């Protein structure tokens, strides 16, 4: 429905989409994205574990599905935006430089928190951390909104034939 290309490892062994579904119950797991590989911590499916992390990270909410949406956003940045000079310039204009020092931004975010007034321009406090995270958080929130509309349509709370016609992006 979104007309986004899904390129797997079978088609692109280096950057195709793949998943590592691991559990921090057995080993340390970091949710993240690298070169098309999305790693998710299945232990976050446990309510108590996830809630402990949510409180520790000072997040208003935290879900495994939210992490999935967020990391898929990183994948689509590299698949669609990072490979197109025009899209990359538009990204820079809207979100900032995706090549800004990530570790520096991460350290600043966890030591200082989100800047005052962040709610005026960002979908989450984490989005303030770095342009790449702003994109991924925005993408995740968009998918969340779309899922909500699809659910509403399935229960006749919205027009079932509503479409969001757009030009297909990507190669």
Predicted regions and their residues:
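Auxiliary, metal-adjacent structural segments of Zn-dependent hydrolase domains
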Residues: 1-47
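Flexible glycine/proline-enriched surface loops and loop-helix/loop-strand junctions
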Residues: 56-59, 118-124
């Amino acid at each position: 429905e979104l007309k986004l290309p899904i390129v797997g490892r079978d088609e692109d062994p280096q950057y195709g989409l793949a998943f590592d579904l691991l559990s921090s119950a057995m080993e340390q797991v970091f949710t993240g994205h690298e070169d098309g590989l999305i790693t998710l911590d299945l232990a976050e499916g446990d309510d108590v574990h996830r809630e402990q992390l949510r409180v520790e990270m000072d997040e208003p909410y935290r879900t495994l599905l939210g992490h999935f949406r967020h990391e898929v956003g990183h994948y689509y940045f590299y698949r669609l935006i990072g490979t197109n000079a025009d899209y990359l310039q538009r990204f820079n204009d809207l979100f900032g430089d995706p090549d800004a020092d990530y570790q520096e931004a991460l350290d600043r975010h966890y030591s200082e928190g989100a800047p005052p007034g962040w709610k005026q321009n960002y979908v989450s406090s984490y989005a303030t951390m770095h342009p790449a995270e702003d994109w991924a958080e925005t993408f995740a929130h968009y998918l969340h909104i779309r899922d909500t509309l699809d659910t509403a349509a399935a229960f006749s709370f919205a027009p079932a034939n509503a479409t969001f016609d757009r030009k297909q992006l990507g190669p």
